[in-house]
């Protein structure tokens, strides 16, 4: 397989990690059969008939539409209808249950370790997959295409958590990647681990000779992209609870009984995965930063505020870029660069402070809420005598992840252009409200970004009809599921830009970037003023 085909496999794996739990859960609840028996079904009809959480059921149905099993229509009423692929998929749905059981069983163990009990549960699945006996035989060529798609789902659920564990635990160190090795060199239970390596050998990731394993070129391709799986796999604690999400008490899925600890996502894994995924877009940000800090000194911002600074890596990177590659870098003695890391999470602030000190970078670290810029500006002025408006404001993949606030204006809104599925704690949110909430959120920031603007990297949804035509060419399905079920609000790129305009702000086209630059665009960089 060439690189394009291998990249396509990753996208299909990610599709599977989110879609398989939905298929099994809806099949168990007889919702798939109900859809099969009816031509068109409205969301409200399904939610009422099956006593489902309407908001998350909407997310689930849109995922199935993105995978080509349903047609999904938002206006005039939200409804779905089966496509020609639907009944073929339904024929295989029962056979996917053991995979879902394995996912659920694994959640009782450490997400980032290989333990004996999950291995034992995994072993028969690996064997039946390798023997191609997990799914019934295809009836014809068309049926075989659906079977292949579902086999990728299974493969994704088996491979995804595995490659992330290997990546986070040092398997892709040069020691293993550049020479052959035995199972016992890596794991204290070599017999079980060997079964896993044999499965990966079946997938052509390794060559095996006399119980020695060595990476193939194909295996190296996946190993180097292990972080691509990290964000989606980090949500398996939530996806494994699909029954609760769709039909139960959703608060049990999101937080522990004390209400403090996130239990729907493995945050360390999420950060590890997103770090790898974000690197591509930071290169484009470099170009924009260099341009801004090469302007005459009196036209430059006093510094940068990174909202949602995480571990401080972006601030550290930006400092090095400005110091070494811009006019400002030559005048830091007379025009010091004020770097500010702001985050809602106290642990992130501690890590940022420690990392910046360790790298000999002077920076301010401050608690901040993306939904309350007035307080942030006051604290910044009070503690450091810095005006928020004198800084270039930045954030990466954050605005869609703000805590839901119902918009002040809910009546007389323009009809939404979005085809997204949005919820808060399982409750269905009108798309008009989601757009208006973003408009009002941006308006809060307007007084503080009028001078130098807001440089924002943002994630977007795309129409499920576009996604379904591009299976294997986009990660949109995985993004829609993980964000939809965790109450995050990713709007289409054109809808996002329209919300910016409605807020009274504008987009500087000179600083706009879109990835990819076609109808599949689901990541953008904008300078908003």
Task: Please provide the spans of the model-predicted regions.
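Conserved adenosyl
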Residues: 113-182, 186-190, 205, 225, ...
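Helix-to-beta-strand junctions that scaffold the AdoMet/dcAdoMet cofactor pocket
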Residues: 449-450
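N-terminal accessory segments
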Residues: 1-241, 301
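Well-ordered, non-membrane alpha-helical segments in soluble/globular domains
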Residues: 194, 238, 287, 318, ...
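Mobile active-site "lid"/loop adjacent to the S-adenosyl-L-methionine
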Residues: 394-436
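C-terminal alpha-helical "lid/dimerization" subdomain adjacent to the S-adenosyl-L-methionine
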Residues: 421-430, 453-509
């Amino acid at each position: 397989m060439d690189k394009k085909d291998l990249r396509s496999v990753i996208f299909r794996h990610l599709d599977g990690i989110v879609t398989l739990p939905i298929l099994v859960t809806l099949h168990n609840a007889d919702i798939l059969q109900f859809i099969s028996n009816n031509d068109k079904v409205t969301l409200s009809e399904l939610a009422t008939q099956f006593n489902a959480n309407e908001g998350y059921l909407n997310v689930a149905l849109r995922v199935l539409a993105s995978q080509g099993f349903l047609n999904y229509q938002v206006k005039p009423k939200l409804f779905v209808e089966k496509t020609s692929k639907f009944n073929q998929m339904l024929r295989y749905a029962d056979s996917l249950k053991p995979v879902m059981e394995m996912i659920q069983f694994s959640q009782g163990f450490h997400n980032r370790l290989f333990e004996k009990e999950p291995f034992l549960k995994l072993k028969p699945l690996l064997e039946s997959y390798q023997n191609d006996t997990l799914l019934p035989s295809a009836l014809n060529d068309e049926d075989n295409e659906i079977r292949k798609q579902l086999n990728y789902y299974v493969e994704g659920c088996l491979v995804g958590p595995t490659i992330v564990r290997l990546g986070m635990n040092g398997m892709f160190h040069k020691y293993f990647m550049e020479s052959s090795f035995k199972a016992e060199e890596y794991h204290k239970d070599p017999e079980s681990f060997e079964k896993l390596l044999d499965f990966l050998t079946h997938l052509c990731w390794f060559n095996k000779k006399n119980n020695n394993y060595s990476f193939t070129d194909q295996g190296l391709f996946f190993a180097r992209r292990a972080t691509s799986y990290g964000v989606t796999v980090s949500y398996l604690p939530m996806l494994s609870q699909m029954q609760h999400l769709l039909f139960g008490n959703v608060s049990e899925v999101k937080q522990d009984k004390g209400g403090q600890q996130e239990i729907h996502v493995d945050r360390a894994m999420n950060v590890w995965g997103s770090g790898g995924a974000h690197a591509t877009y930071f290169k484009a940000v470099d170009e924009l930063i260099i341009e801004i800090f090469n302007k005459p000194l009196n036209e430059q911002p006093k510094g940068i505020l990174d909202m949602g600074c995480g571990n401080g890596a972006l601030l550290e990177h930006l400092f090095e870029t400005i110091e070494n590659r811009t006019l400002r870098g030559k005048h830091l003695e007379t025009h010091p660069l004020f770097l500010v890391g702001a985050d809602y999470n106290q642990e992130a602030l501690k890590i940022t402070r420690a990392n910046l000190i360790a790298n000999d970078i002077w920076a301010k670290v401050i608690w901040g809420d993306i939904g309350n810029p007035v307080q942030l500006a006051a604290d910044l002025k009070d503690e450091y005598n810095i005006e928020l408006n004198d800084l270039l404001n930045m954030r990466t993949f954050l605005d869609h992840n703000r805590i839901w606030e119902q918009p002040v204006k809910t009546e007389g809104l323009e009809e939404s252009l979005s085809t997204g599925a949005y919820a808060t704690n399982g409750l269905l949110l009108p798309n008009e409200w989601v757009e208006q909430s973003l408009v009002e959120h941006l308006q809060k920031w307007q007084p503080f970004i009028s001078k130098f603007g807001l440089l924002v990297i943002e994630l977007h949804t795309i129409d499920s009809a576009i996604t379904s035509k591009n299976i294997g060419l986009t990660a949109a399905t995985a993004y829609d599921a993980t964000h939809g079920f965790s109450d995050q609000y990713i709007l289409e790129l054109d809808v996002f830009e329209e919300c910016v305009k409605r807020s009274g702000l504008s987009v500087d086209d000179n600083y706009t970037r879109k990835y990819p630059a076609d109808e599949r665009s689901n990541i953008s960089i904008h300078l908003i003023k």
